Amino acid sequence: MFKTKRSLLNSSIAISFAVLGVQAQAETLELQAESFANSGGTYSDGQPNPVTIYNVNGQGAINFVNAGDYVDYNINALGGEYDIEYFVGTGVTSGPNIEVLVDVNGTWQSQGSVAVPYGSWDDFQSLTPSHTVTLPVGTSTVRLLAVGSTWQWNLESFRLTQVSPVEPVGDADNDGVNDNQDLCPNSPSGVTVDNNGCQITGGTDPGGESFVIQMEAFDSTGSDDSRAKGVIIGERGYPQDKHTVVDSVQTTDWVDYSINFPSSANYSVSMLASGQTDHATAVLYLDGTEINEVPVHTGSQADFANFQLAGSVYIASGTHTIRVQAQSSTGEFSWLWFGDALTFTNLDSDGGNGGEATQDADNDGVLDSSDSCPNTPTGEPADVTGCSASQLDDDNDGVSNNVDQCPNTVAGTEVDADGCEVIFADADNDGIEDSQDFCPNTPAGEAVNNSGCGASQLDADNDGVTNNIDQCPNTPAGTQVDASGCETDNGGEPGDSYYHNGQGLLFGRVDGATNFLGEEGYVANPDNYDVTTDLLETDDAIRANSTEVFRGEIYDADGHIAFYEHIDDSVRLYIDGQLVLSNDSWENSSQTTDLNLTPGWHNFELRLGNADGGSGAVSGIGFGIDVDGGTNFVHPSNLSPSMFRASGQVVVDPILPPSGGIYIQLEDFDETGTVGRVASDPNDGFVKGDSNVGWVTNGDWGKYHNVFLEAGTYRAFITVSTPAGGSYGARVDIDGEPFAWGYFDSTGGWDIAAEYELYGGHLVVESTGNHTLHVEAVGGSDWQWSGDLVRLAKVSDSAVKQPRVYNPNEHIVAEIQGPATGLQYLKTPVEIPLANKVLKSDVWYTYPQNRNLVVDGDTPYADFGATGAFWGHPPEHDFYDDTVIMDWAVNVVDDFQSEGFEYTARGEFDWGYGWFTEFTTNPQPHYVQTLDGRNVRMTFMGYLSHDGYNNNWLSNHSPAFVPFMKSQVDQILKANPDKLMFDTQTNSTRSTDMRTFGGDFSPYAMENFRVWLLKKYSNAQLVSMGINDITSFDYGAYLRAQGITHTDWSNAGDTISGNIPMMEDFIYFNRDVWNQKFAEVLEYIRQQRPNIEIGASTHLFESRGYIFNENITFLSGELNLGARTSISELPTNILVHLKGAQAVDKTLAYFPYPWEFDELRIQNAPRFGRGWVAQAYAYGGLFSIPANVWVGGEVFTWSPGADNYRDIYQFVRAQANLLDGYTSYAKAGYVHAMFSSMKAGFIDGGNQVQSSVKILTEDNINFDMLVFGDAGYPVVPRQADFDKFEYIFYDGDLNYLTAEQQAVLDAQGSKVKHIGQRGTIAGLQINVSINGSVSNETVSAVSRIHETDSTAPYVVHLINRPFAGGVTPILNNVEVAIPASYFPQGVTSAKLHLPDGSSSTVAVSTNANGDTVVSVSNLEVWGILELAH
């Protein structure tokens, strides 16, 4: 389909042009090659279509064009003689020609041909033949035909330029048909004519006057569901029939169009669309009124059809809003359809009847010309005006006649949904209806709020004194007050007290992180410092090395109650003196079952212990209760305060804040700015108010100079107001170093201020004098607080600070090396002893704790045959506290290993942000900084903050980077893990990728870039680049001086485009420094543990951050599996990574991103993941056990079911002898250019490599990759790598090779073939047939042989790729045909092993081609053929 795109102007303008027939008068027509309307040809080049669409450097083009292939283009021209110019390339030295033909009345007439000169397939050069092309006026079809030698040319586009116009032809009778075509030259004015210019007569045939709206030209889009975001513009269809569509359409997504209708009429409305979701519908709205809903389903994303959204709807002339909304007939939230165009057809065109239409569009028996209600619902009787009961409201009460139970309501009466008068009941005459009145006995005359409550009935501050007599209306919770509602004077000193007897629990605190019964130092009856009625303290931070105690009684009304906790450290809950809840894990929650208590009051004591000061709820609520004894836990603050009671003496908390001190009014700042980026905040920094600062968003700061402070230790407080909900915090620095920090809850609204203590930090001023204070907003929420003041209260003269972990003077920073020169080779990984190796049959839990996951009282994952765990997380905080580390070592690592499992400990980058704050205390100078000086926050992991600093990106260029990574090694190795794995994927080279980040322009990065450039270029070269003084050169300043912004860089950096100076150099430099610095860390590990396996989440296809290092011996990480695209067949995109890991001789262990299993949850397809597991092991990888999977959102975790996966993992262990020691076996190599991935938008490589891997896989041509690096690190394979293969395939990414790399490939001679020639080579495929039909796309046959034992059986893994409803269909009558010369020796017999535990000898025969044929049945998702030879 060739679609001329218009700019996205207001649709009403576009429609006016469409209706009036206005055409742009262009003299040049430019056509993209891939936009052909039709293609053909008979040459067998192994492709599914005669020509193929592909991409070259972001441009669409066509390839696989052979002699006899053609492409057709529909065009609309002014007519006349045209020059034609092709943008074409070929790698064939002689023979390729292009002939152009024009369809003239059904006959193709040649316009001439031209030879295509030799060059390169993807180097498109201008070619203008001497002949011209004659085009008729209006629409016509042009054909480009390949003539000459077999392999022809690739085409990017062609251009037709008018050189001689057609003489104009008149239209004397103005009927729209030119005189030279008009068979009725004197038609009366205004009549409707046919294509011959003759009047159409008789009948009520609508004239068919219509116009089309391209759906991507919408005015606005949105959704009624928070999970959806509205549509995007995309492309769907077959290569020869592409449609530009509204894409990513999910349930409730809508598109609006403002359309100027030229005349009042009845219109039919249809939508051209495709869709494979059988419950998808489309709803048509006219000016907000729903007109109709119809199913939209074609069975495929590529097959388009017209769907009638309305058979007839009356629309008055003028501008109207048309909305099309996606819905689901089952109410399911999912992807739905792809919309191309809307067609509006005027049904009331008079059809030559002389004027008045004779239609009745809504079939109600009243002609449209007399119909007052033109859209009467089908089947409803209408009156003489054409209106039905559902369209009338005789008493004008807003309820239509068909449902009005009181049809004669007096005008102005308030009615209910039945049209009957609403009777208003208000017993206390306060103006609030009784059903809505929360205070039914309001004193006469007293003003009330919307709930019907007056001041004498309210107590806003819960101090026991009603609002009408409360002289202190904002008393803090728990304060003892007098009769006027004001605080009683208890002296404010420790020891003063009052007696409490009533609602709530007594709250106290004792020293010690585990002050529990039976522990040393246990305090049975600690002092009570407060009374809490809501237990919100359970979700707050707990003071370091202390235990909070909540005591009193709890009321259980029916004898059923259960409790839950998710507190970061230790918990004990006692009911009637019995321990019912006990947990010391900082990461796992715990809960009770129904306690089945006797109804009534019960003694209650809750103790929460903390060792470090960061404690509180880990996620969700910290402490919860289900009053029905189930699992619907809610925080006590959401329950009635009357369920708790207590009595006892309450004393003043000894840590209550002291009064007075130094006050810093926040509006008196000397400087302000921001290190954050909140799009909705137009201000960079604090905005000064009369007595506060406002518009404070995350990262905003203010500086205050010349603040006089005495040396000593202080306590710090800040007075702020915040929105109703969120995560808030502040940090105070003194003279550039962190002093105090704290996080706090909402104050309840912007107009409610509260003072909070900034409890973290050293809080020490070392010298008396003037200082500069820096106050910064930190925390989870974008919008933070309005600030009044900071108060610093001195509490002692001590000015001693604790030493920091990181001392720069203790570390030597290596000089930055220059770029690699000359051709490079991939380094062979360090040899690891067999006892320590990652084995191909290893089965790993994703997390160690999965082995003990309890489901319905059972541990269903304990019998999976697991050998270890994938992600062993060290403690998230207090990482440098050896007590904490040794607790982890003994209670987690050693405990896991004692059960016979291997523990893989994980070093961190993104999740290590808190460790880095603890390591440096002041991490700010070490962060990545963008071109506009902002920190880069790792938002993909959430909006987190620790010790006063957010989860900002650490720069690899920082001098603290290597010491920090080595410190991780030191701490982790104290636990003696079996293996190490580093989540290197989130190193700061990634900040040069993805448009949300924007590169690293920190001072350390700029300093290192100077050194790198000086080592790559001579002074003369630097001057030619505009660098006159390299010693002072700052790349960021250089770019800003040229007007390049952060946005410019981000957009260009994503795909290395946009002509940004030195961009490629900067990306290569970042990778070089990353490789150098992390190599130092890896060598440090290897010196301490020579035989340990070291893994890293580094992949060839995220080439900006790939680590070329032999000390990494296995690969790991989270990867994309494409479940949101399809769960009807197994993905091939993951095979790119598995083949990449094979190419570098490193096993890949992985797990999918959270959204992948979430999609299986949404589609109720838990067994689809079986295919992911089978495919991983078949290709030599490891897929960790999906036990309790994190899916995010409101669901948090989901279990796809142990029973769905147990047999697969047990099968892996049972067939260890056919997995361990085996490697890929292929007769074909595939050339992969790493630079193609550098320009890709995601970590799965570019479109070309994905396409080629899919083609080879679905042809059952086993292959392995030959890796060619980029210009920054020009890796080439060794000759031994080439020698493994009989043939080597390349594709369109060949143009990314350097000249030197191309020469190495060319040296391999005739074995190098274009991937399109694969079908001409015998002996490469293992052909799989089902019921006699070749079905290579259905079952993949993956061949592997033993690395060292030539007598070991050959192995072919059979992967059944299709799924139906999330389940693999079982296949019978499967035949696997292996070419006689495929393996080194002939196959003599075969056994089939299946996950159901069965192993059987299967028939082996020989077909007419001499292939060995193995017969297989009962194949579900995976089978292993063991082949003797």
From Swiss-Prot:
Residues 349-400, 474-495 are annotated as: Disordered. Inactive above 60 degrees Celsius. It catalyses: Endohydrolysis of 1,3-alpha-L-galactosidic linkages in agarose, yielding agarotetraose as the major product. Residues 369-378 have a biased composition (Polar residues). Its EC number is 3.2.1.158. Residues 1-26 form the signal peptide. It comes from the Bacteria. It is an enzyme of class 3 (hydrolase). Optimum pH is 7.2. Active between pH 6.0 and 9.0. Keywords: Calcium, Carbohydrate metabolism, Glycosidase, Hydrolase, Metal-binding, Polysaccharide degradation, Repeat, Signal. Alpha-agarase. Does not hydrolyze agarotetraose, agarohexaose, kappa-carrageenan, iota-carrageenan or lambda-carrageenan. Homodimer. This is Alpha-agarase. The lineage of its organism: Bacteria, Pseudomonadati, Pseudomonadota, Gammaproteobacteria, Alteromonadales. The gene is agaA.
